[in-house]
UniProtKB/Swiss-Prot annotation:
The gene is thiG. CDD domains: ThiG. The lineage of its organism: Bacteria, Pseudomonadati, Rhodothermota, Rhodothermia, Rhodothermales. Belongs to the ThiG family. GO terms for cellular component: cytoplasm. This is Thiazole synthase. GO terms for biological process: thiamine diphosphate biosynthetic process. PANTHER family: THIAZOLE SYNTHASE (PTHR34266:SF2). It is found in: Cytoplasm. Catalyzes the rearrangement of 1-deoxy-D-xylulose 5-phosphate (DXP) to produce the thiazole phosphate moiety of thiamine. Sulfur is provided by the thiocarboxylate moiety of the carrier protein ThiS. In vitro, sulfur can be provided by H(2)S. It comes from the Bacteria. InterPro entries: Aldolase_TIM, Thiazole_synthase_ThiG, ThiG. Pathway: Cofactor biosynthesis; thiamine diphosphate biosynthesis. GO terms for molecular function: thiazole synthase activity. Keywords: Cytoplasm, Schiff base, Thiamine biosynthesis, Transferase.
């Protein structure tokens, strides 16, 4: 990739623009879910198209202790992907902590995507249980990536607890509604400067990914938008390009919005003057 030169002379080297989460570093800023694909081969092809290095797996849906040949985990490992176990399906802090510890023991990773859901219809986080689980798991040495509401106060509390990344939702899980509250996401970004922020849930197409990155977010997590697309591999490729474009645009610095027009050409030298 090329360097980006800012107006003040600063140069942003895109090749060195790694996503750092705790002690882990990734060149790709896309995290991808591994469910709902038409078949395993489509999943693998789509993952490759995104350029992702970190893929998330729901622990309750896989046999982590005795993964059979050609199992979900086996395919991902042989593909060279780092697995990010998640606690999807947990409704209490106790369930999430137990699931996380089982995953660490079986998979040998400190990485964890923490989800503590409040109900089956909205799949929104239960904030009280989420904060309780986050504190316990951070104290227990996990590198916690916490799925959260798009609430600035909750997100700040998660960052203050020591979560390695905070993942506010763009809209409800699987809805494809995109970024429905960019104002809250912008406030969260301004309030939390030193902790990676990743938009998780609701992304429906590539333009949503661009929006997330232009808001200054460090990455996105996407699953349904790719897995359920008419052509998952093409959508995976589109997401990769969208994240790169949005990241570059954010780093380049957009022009301020103006209420009135401003001519781009000088008015000097007009004919008849």
């Amino acid at each position: 990739m090329s360097d980006v030169t800012h107006a003040n002379g600063a140069v942003a080297n895109e090749a060195d623009d790694a996503l750092v989460i705790g002690d882990h570093s990734f060149s790709s800023r896309i995290l991808v879910g591994t469910s709902r694909y038409p078949n395993p081969q489509v999943m693998l092809d789509a993952l490759e198209a995104t350029g992702t290095e970190l893929v998330t797996v729901a622990i309750r849906r896989v046999n982590i202790e005795n993964p059979a040949p050609e199992s979900h985990l086996d395919l991902l490992r042989r593909g060279g992907y780092e697995v990010l176990p998640n606690t999807a399906g947990c409704y209490t802090a106790r369930e999430a902590v137990l699931t996380a510890r089982l995953a660490r023991e079986a998979l040998g990773t400190d990485l964890l995507k923490l989800e503590v859901i409040g109900d089956d219809e909205t799949l929104m986080p239960d904030v009280e249980q989420l904060l309780d689980a986050a504190k316990t798991l951070v104290d227990d040495g996990f590198t916690v990536l916490a799925y959260a509401n798009d609430d600035p106060i909750t997100c700040r509390k998660l960052a203050d607890l020591g979560c390695a990344a905070v993942m506010p939702l763009g809209s409800p899980i699987g809805s494809g509604m995109g970024i429905v509250n960019p104002y809250n996401l912008r406030i969260i970004r301004e309030m939390i400067e030193d902790t990676p922020l990743i938009v998780d849930a609701g992304i429906g197409t590539a333009s949503d990914a661009v929006t997330a990155m232009e808001l200054g977010y460090d990455g996105i997590l996407v699953n349904t938008a790719i897995a359920q697309a008419q052509h998952p591999v093409d959508m995976g490729r589109a997401m990769r390009k969208a994240v790169e474009a949005g990241r570059s645009a954010h780093r380049a610095g957009r022009i301020p919005r103006r209420l009135y027009a401003e001519a781009s050409s000088s008015m000097e030298g007009r004919i008849g003057t």
